[in-house]
Amino acid sequence: MVSDIFRCIIDNGQIPQIWKSSLIIPLYKKGEKSDPKNYRPISLTCTLCRILERIIAQQLTKFLEDNKFFNKNQFGFLKHRSTTTQLLSTMDDLYNAIQDGYNIDIIYIDFAKAFDTVPINILLDKIESAGIGGRVYTFLKNFISDRNFKIKIGDQLSHNYETFSGVPQGSVLGPLLFLIFINDLPNEIPENVGVKLYADDVKLYIAHKNGIEREQLNKTLGILEKWTELNGLEISPSKCFALYLGKNNMKREYNIHGLKVQETECIRDLGLLIDTKISFNNHINMIIKNAYLKAPKL
């Protein structure tokens, strides 16, 4: 029965409209409860649709992997890639450069609501460019179009709101669709500038011994600005940071959209605290502090 429904949906490329509706439940994080920014939206979607999504996602991922589609610098939501493998790859680059006498500048990029603002028309073009056509393309087009959601707070339920952009939050296919969307970004980065992604988390870095090499990183930020403009995303300059590694690494100014990138002495990179000396003292101290706080509860 269920398999017949799935087969009919894939053959016709049409998903029941109710399957494209989601329920948003705001989950309180911390801070002032009257401030909406202190809530994390949890999106609940149709269970039956999620089963079908998982089947399609597995086959689609295999197709893309077999065709070597995914950029080697993307580590998010992919088999045999993770935050750990990304950090290991990054640290290998950093340590090798420092041992060779280079200093390193790293820019951490923050996109504003990246998953929610993906333009559907551009996403569809990229899906097609990835070699995805026929019934699967028709299904994906229907899946990401004409979606709506309601918000539930306590026993109160809002009316329907339509979504006009973004990959479906809370869905199984959403992360994969975003990877397809952002996959071409690393190709725009010059070869001498390092780039690492974990889904929408992006960092750019350059090893340098002179100002000319550092200027290349500033030019790369301009390339990134142009890419975001062409692809309908926005960078949040106030949430971007610059970290300077190496002995006597004189700080220089980097700019995004005419605004200076904030400098930092320590930053959380995929859960790991990295400081200017790559000593990991801050991370070790954080672990010790958390252990002391949790020990009495054991």
Regions found by a protein language model. Give the residues of each.
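Active-site palm subdomain of RNA-directed nucleic acid polymerases
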Residues: 56-74, 99, 175-205
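Basic, alpha-helical interaction scaffolds
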Residues: 259-298
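Conserved pre-catalytic core of RNA-dependent polymerases
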Residues: 1-168, 207
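Short helix/loop segment flanking the catalytic signature motif in cyclic-nucleotide metabolism enzymes
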Residues: 208-219
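Short, conserved micro-motifs composed of acidic
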Residues: 155, 219-222, 234-267
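Hydrophobic alpha-helical membrane-association signature
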Residues: 90, 177-181, 217-220, 291-294
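Catalytic palm active-site di-aspartate
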Residues: 21-24, 40, 74, 104-114, ...
